[in-house]
């Protein structure tokens, strides 16, 4: 549109009738131009009020939402980083606690094993001592039985030998003496 006005201005300077001719050729009537300008301003006002202004408001609202979303995303990133650090600290603490529990369990198991070993050794020693006592008792009983049997055999043998050569009173004294001797053994 600007070149048209420039051309009209040049033509008016060069030839005054040429502008009127151009205005007539293009149908430029000041009354119509004023009406068109007024109509354009009305349409522009309606468009601004009902189309452009709500669109700008929606765009600003959307920009605010996007800004709030970005801010929220940054906050969430910070919270995520903090949560990751916290979870890493919790995992590390849990690992330390688990190691401590495992070490304590090992120590308890070792103590229990040592205690059980000591108890088993004590029971074995006690069983061995009881077995030795039983063997000793059995040995004494066997010796006593053997002494009794030997004494009986000696008495019988002595009776047979002495029955032929000794008198009854000598035999009784000899039997009593032999019995005393065997009892002391």
Curated annotation (Swiss-Prot):
Pfam families: ATP-synt_B. The keyword Ion transport applies. It is found in: Cell inner membrane. Disulfide bonds: none annotated. It is a single-pass membrane protein. The chain crosses the membrane at residues 32-52. InterPro entries: ATP_synth_B-like_membr_sf, ATP_synth_b/b'su_bac/chlpt, ATP_synth_F0_bsu_bac, ATP_synthase_B_chain. Keywords: ATP synthesis, Cell inner membrane, Cell membrane, CF(0), Hydrogen ion transport, Ion transport, Membrane, Transmembrane, Transmembrane helix, Transport. One of its GO terms (molecular function) is proton-transporting ATPase activity, rotational mechanism. One of its GO terms (cellular component) is proton-transporting ATP synthase complex. SUPFAM superfamilies: F1F0 ATP synthase subunit B, membrane domain. F(1)F(0) ATP synthase produces ATP from ADP in the presence of a proton or sodium gradient. F-type ATPases consist of two structural domains, F(1) containing the extramembraneous catalytic core and F(0) containing the membrane proton channel, linked together by a central stalk and a peripheral stalk. During catalysis, ATP synthesis in the catalytic domain of F(1) is coupled via a rotary mechanism of the central stalk subunits to proton translocation. Belongs to the ATPase B chain family. F-type ATPases have 2 components, F(1) - the catalytic core - and F(0) - the membrane proton channel. F(1) has five subunits: alpha(3), beta(3), gamma(1), delta(1), epsilon(1). F(0) has three main subunits: a(1), b(2) and c(10-14). The alpha and beta chains form an alternating ring which encloses part of the gamma chain. F(1) is attached to F(0) by a central stalk formed by the gamma and epsilon chains, while a peripheral stalk is formed by the delta and b chains. This is ATP synthase subunit b. It comes from Opitutus terrae (strain DSM 11246 / JCM 15787 / PB90-1). The gene is atpF.
């Amino acid at each position: 549109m600007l070149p048209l006005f420039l051309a009209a201005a040049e033509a008016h300077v060069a030839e005054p009738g040429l502008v009127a001719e151009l205005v007539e050729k293009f149908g430029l009537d000041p009354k119509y131009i004023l009406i068109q300008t007024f109509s354009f301003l009305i349409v522009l006002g309606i468009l601004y009020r009902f189309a452009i202004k709500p669109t700008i408001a929606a765009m600003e609202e959307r920009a605010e939402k996007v800004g709030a979303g970005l801010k929220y995303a940054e906050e969430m990133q910070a919270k995520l980083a903090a949560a990751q650090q916290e979870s890493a600290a919790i995992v590390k603490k849990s690992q330390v606690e688990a190691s401590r529990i495992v070490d304590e369990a090992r120590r308890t198991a070792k103590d229990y094993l040592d205690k059980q070993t000591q108890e088993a050794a004590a029971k074995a020693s006690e069983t061995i001592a009881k077995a030795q006592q039983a063997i000793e008792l059995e040995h004494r009983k066997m010796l006593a039985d053997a002494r009794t049997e030997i004494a009986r055999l000696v008495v019988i043998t002595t009776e047979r030998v002495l029955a032929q050569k000794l008198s009854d009173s000598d035999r009784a004294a000899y039997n009593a003496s032999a019995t005393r001797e065997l009892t002391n053994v």
